[in-house]
Swiss-Prot record:
Keywords recorded for this protein, A-Z: Chaperone, Isomerase, Mitochondrion, Rotamase, Transit peptide
Compartments, record wording: Mitochondrion
Database matches in Gene3D superfamilies: Cyclophilin-like
Enzyme class: isomerase
PANTHER family linked to this entry: PEPTIDYL-PROLYL CIS-TRANS ISOMERASE CYP21-3, MITOCHONDRIAL, PEPTIDYL-PROLYL CIS-TRANS ISOMERASE CYP21-4
Induction line: Repressed by the munition hexahydro-1,3,5-trinitro-1,3,5-triazine, also known as Royal Demolition eXplosive (RDX).
Protein name (record): Peptidyl-prolyl cis-trans isomerase CYP21-3, mitochondrial
The protein's Enzyme Commission number: 5.2.1.8
Regulation of its function: Binds cyclosporin A (CsA). CsA mediates some of its effects via an inhibitory action on PPIase.
Catalytic activity: [protein]-peptidylproline (omega=180) = [protein]-peptidylproline (omega=0)
Molecular-function annotations in GO: peptidyl-prolyl cis-trans isomerase activity
GO cellular component, one term: Golgi apparatus
Length: 230
């Protein structure tokens, strides 16, 4: 057996005891991996906290289309429940007949736009207006012409619509019409009807108003919840 020289033994000993070097490339890779892991965990946390803020009904999310990209029509909300100071009013949304307006309405719901909204004008046994606009000729016309309404026309009651004229402020207002109004479709784009809470609408109509049909005591929409079914 050949003898190993002392000098060779010393070199082998140094190789065994010396610390291994970590290349800069490895350091960069490890750092990127850690940052990626932190980003994934943070994104998951943000998504979880966001979902926890979404209202639910019967264990399902009820996010209030354009607001819902990628969802099938069968999965989209079909009802909106207004929680008001007088009680709850549920509106069936006419997605098939007024898709653009319904999409806009749902987007405003999702953004919380209607929270704190006031019923700004009320005409007893006729119409209530949610939102404020300087242009309310339709309300004045209907109020002044109540006695001349042609009740033989079969317009459904408790329809919900928004003015056809563009809102210059970029907002959204809507009317709940509790009477048969002959020029309803000329004034408004109808996008729904009250399917539950007609008594609440009638109670709102009973409030005392001034000569501009504005309620003397504010009636507020506290929240709007969108549902797939009732």
């Amino acid at each position: 057996m050949a003898k190993i020289k002392p000098q060779a033994l010393l070199q082998q000993s140094k190789k065994k005891k010396g610390p291994s070097r970590i290349s800069i490339t490895n350091i960069v890779i490890y750092t990127l991996a850690v940052l990626l892991l932190v980003f994934v965990l943070f994104s998951a946390y943000r998504r979880w906290t966001h979902r926890s803020e979404i209202p639910t009904h019967n264990g399902r999310s009820v996010l209030e289309d354009a607001a819902f990209p990628g969802m099938k029509n069968v999965d989209l909300p079909r009802f909106a429940t207004l929680d008001t100071g007088k009680g709850s009013v549920t509106i069936e949304l006419f997605k098939d007949t007024a898709p653009n307006v319904v999409d806009q309405f749902m987007k405003f719901c999702q953004d919380g736009y209607f929270k704190g909204f006031l019923f700004s004008r009320v005409v007893k046994h006729f119409v209530i207006q949610a939102g404020d606009s300087a242009e309310f000729d339709a309300v004045k016309d209907w109020a002044l012409d109540r006695k001349n309404i042609d009740t033989s026309l079969k317009h459904e009651e408790f329809m919900v619509g928004t003015p056809k004229a563009k809102n210059e402020q970029g907002g959204f207002e809507f009317f709940i019409v509790s009477a048969q109004i002959k020029d309803l479709n000329e004034k408004l784009t109808v996008f729904g009807r009250v399917s539950k809470g007609q008594d609440v609408v009638q109670e709102i109509e009973e409030v005392e108003t001034d000569d501009q049909y504005q309620p003397k005591s504010p009636i507020e929409i506290m929240s709007v919840t969108l549902l797939q079914d009732m």
